[in-house]
């Protein structure tokens, strides 16, 4: 709905503002949830509850300082950022100033999420994320509409619409922080009671704790910063390359909007699931590393990669098969042909991002923190060369960005996989992890395409055709993966509602054990 309100040009400004916001958020505090969960889990595994509580408190101070400092920089430096880096996106300073306090809110929220994850509970994080997205979606639409109405005579009308979308981001984050704050208030007596019963007196000083936080968070920040830099570099190269070809600013902003707020937005949904799996894996993996249980480490890594592939393959195939119908359904007023083609040709990035995300989490958990950074830098260098070459010497236009978005995680995947294999001395099982999900997804894709086309020919309505197509997609993939023994009963239990799914599977004789 927001795309229909502010248009592709407004979404281009919105996406460019978020590129800046994301990289500054990463620099200030993005790595805190993972870092805090890793440090808290390590302390709790050794029953050092006083140390775990101190890690949390010092991490919170660090987040408040770094998040506050970066928020002030964005608010007062928004005009300079627009003039220096985004001259083609007029008015981008408006949504940037709205996003400035969001950096501070997310910094504090990230530390609270890291605490709960380190305590091996993902529920507060999951609920807060759902609340955040609901508030974000509702407020973004309402705020975009009212701000565009109030500034209808402004030359920066699209920028005001983009600012409305960022208001939703701010209030969504604030609502999630309020929820986590309430949970922490209820949970704090338990933390203090554990700390009082702990007979181990921490020997570390405040300086030692801050050093530990920095050495843990900096590699995570650098790794994520490199990834986010690829987005900003893409926007910058694309901007200059298109200007050099004589393309006007409106067309540039529109194409950038389609790429960022349709293609990247849709592929980011399954990628977010992979990120959540990687985040939930870290505390448990750190505990095994702390106790030196190498068998448990290998088993957990194997399962994390397998679960990611079970989700990533059908997501990539499904988005490719239903690319144009999904774009037309979600963004009816926009260019669904270009957006659909981007999604169709670039959905394979989901598989590579899923694998690179989980393997980066593994390397960080086993204290090989510098390797994901090095791999990301190597991949970024290759990515820049590929994107620049395609934009400079071919007529691919925005599709060069799509191609680059596939090559970046592909290189990281290869380098991470090699390092995980060397450091842990094992090879990932191939048939059930990769071959079964791939084959099941291909068959699922064929069935989904046939069902969609049949229903669309009869009804001529996208929503009438896409619903049965999605039902067939889910049912066929579920049946094929189980029938081909891609998942055992015990593995199925690890999924949400896994026991209920096993009951359904038994009725259709899909499980062999």
Question: Which ranges hold each PLM region?
Answer:
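Signature of the first transmembrane helix
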Residues: 1-34, 64, 71, 75, ...
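Interfacial/gating helices of multi-pass transporter permease domains
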Residues: 2-23, 90-91, 158-163, 209-216, ...
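Helix-loop junctions and terminal segments of transmembrane helices
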Residues: 30-45, 271-293
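Interfacial segments at transmembrane-helix termini and the short loops linking adjacent helices
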Residues: 80-99, 302, 320-350
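Alpha-helical transmembrane segments of multi-pass membrane transporters/permeases
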Residues: 96, 101, 112-142, 146, ...
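Membrane-interface helix-loop junctions in multi-pass transport and translocation proteins
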Residues: 123, 134-183, 370, 380-417, ...
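Transmembrane helical elements of multi-pass membrane transporters/channels
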Residues: 169-176, 180, 184, 200-283, ...
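Membrane-proximal transmembrane or re-entrant/amphipathic helices at the cytosolic face
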Residues: 450-513
